[in-house]
Amino acid sequence: MYIAGVMSGTSLDGIDVALVRIEGSGVESKVELIHFTTVPFCNDIKSEIQQALSIENSNVQLICSLNFKLGLCFANAVKEVCKEANFSLEQLDLIGSHGQTIYHQPKQDGNRIPSTLQIGEPAVIAYETNTTVISNFRTMDMAAGGQGAPLVPYSEVILYRDPSKNRLLQNIGGISNVTVIPTQQSDQNVIAFDTGPGNMIIDEVCQRLFQLPYDQNGEIAKKGVVVDEILTYCMSHPFLKMNPPKSTGREQFGEEFVSELLKRFKKHSKENILTTVTMFTASSIVHHYKKFILPYYEIDEVILGGGGSYNSTLVEMLRNGLKDENCTIFIQEDIGYSSEAKEAIAFAILANETHHRNPSNVPSATGAKQSVVLGNVTFPPI
């Protein structure tokens, strides 16, 4: 089957689309990446997403309209990846669309029950591409008592399991998440959870203090020094004390967190603040390894993916934090994969599993009561 996996993450970099060929289903699936592209959001759409994400500035009228606008954006991104690959849209069998997360409530909070909302209307995508769309992957896991995240572990088992090596798959997107893939294990024995912020705080600080969308290659952070009082404040966040399975998002590490941090520590230089929040991402990852993983597994390899794997300062901080653990750190490209395409490929794989009516959540990672078939299916008009 030819499947387009579509992902728009918490970093708001744009729409990632992976055109993938998949043979079979389940853990024996054969997956081939044909082409990958990222279609940037235009400034107006990005601004509307940011407004929709803000509890203070969002409104139902905006979200209703944006749902359809993003559906059209996602459809156009699928057309673009096919065009770049010289691949006929008519040959496409399926689209797996994650959507844009607007709010994610993994646990009960007062009268707010666990819930999640991703937008990017699948009917618009199906109509514009004349292709079946599978979307809303997180909701069935949450209906089964899970947190709806992380969902990539199933695909990581398919792509990265090794009979002789214990591997950690560390994704550093807006949020960071880790998957433990032991030797000779089935997906139900996989451990996976969010480790905290990835690029989210780094990017927000960059935008506010340097008027830059992100710290390219970690060049600015390389110039500063870590401020202990800021790092101590960050590392005291309640999320770091929670036991897995757990997930987090912009609600905990977004604009409000950064506003409070900059207000508290405004006396420090811009460079030192950026260096310290970069260290916070690295330290939160290392903290979770040492508390929840390394006491139980001897890890042979750590494989980094996501946009954060291109931040050499962050990667060096991780290497230093793990220097005594006798494990080798790679990035996706070192082993023949793409850091950028990883999550889009994951949702192509999940769409394939849903098409075959196979469960593809990992209850040991999400906390769900059982394995479930993920996603809603939207058929094309004809």
From Swiss-Prot:
Catalytic activity as recorded in UniProt: 1,6-anhydro-N-acetyl-beta-muramate + ATP + H2O = N-acetyl-D-muramate 6-phosphate + ADP + H(+)
Keyword Flavoprotein part of the UniProt annotation: no
UniProt binding sites for ATP: G9, T10, S11, L12, D13, G14, I15, D16
Sequence similarity: Belongs to the anhydro-N-acetylmuramic acid kinase family.
Keywords assigned: ATP-binding, Carbohydrate metabolism, Kinase, Nucleotide-binding, Transferase
Origin species: Bacillus cereus (strain ZK / E33L)
Function: Catalyzes the specific phosphorylation of 1,6-anhydro-N-acetylmuramic acid (anhMurNAc) with the simultaneous cleavage of the 1,6-anhydro ring, generating MurNAc-6-P. Is required for the utilization of anhMurNAc either imported from the medium or derived from its own cell wall murein, and thus plays a role in cell wall recycling.
Alphabetical list of InterPro entries matching this protein: Anhydro_N_Ac-Mur_kinase (IPR005338), ATPase_NBD (IPR043129)
Recorded GO MF terms: ATP binding; kinase activity; phosphotransferase activity, alcohol group as acceptor
Gene3D superfamilies in UniProt: 3.30.420.40
Biological processes per GO annotation: 1,6-anhydro-N-acetyl-beta-muramic acid catabolic process; amino sugar metabolic process; peptidoglycan turnover
Keyword field contains Transferase: yes
Pathway recorded for this protein: Amino-sugar metabolism; 1,6-anhydro-N-acetylmuramate degradation; Cell wall biogenesis; peptidoglycan recycling
Name of the protein in its database record: Anhydro-N-acetylmuramic acid kinase
Coiled coil: none
Record-listed E.C. numbers: 2.7.1.170
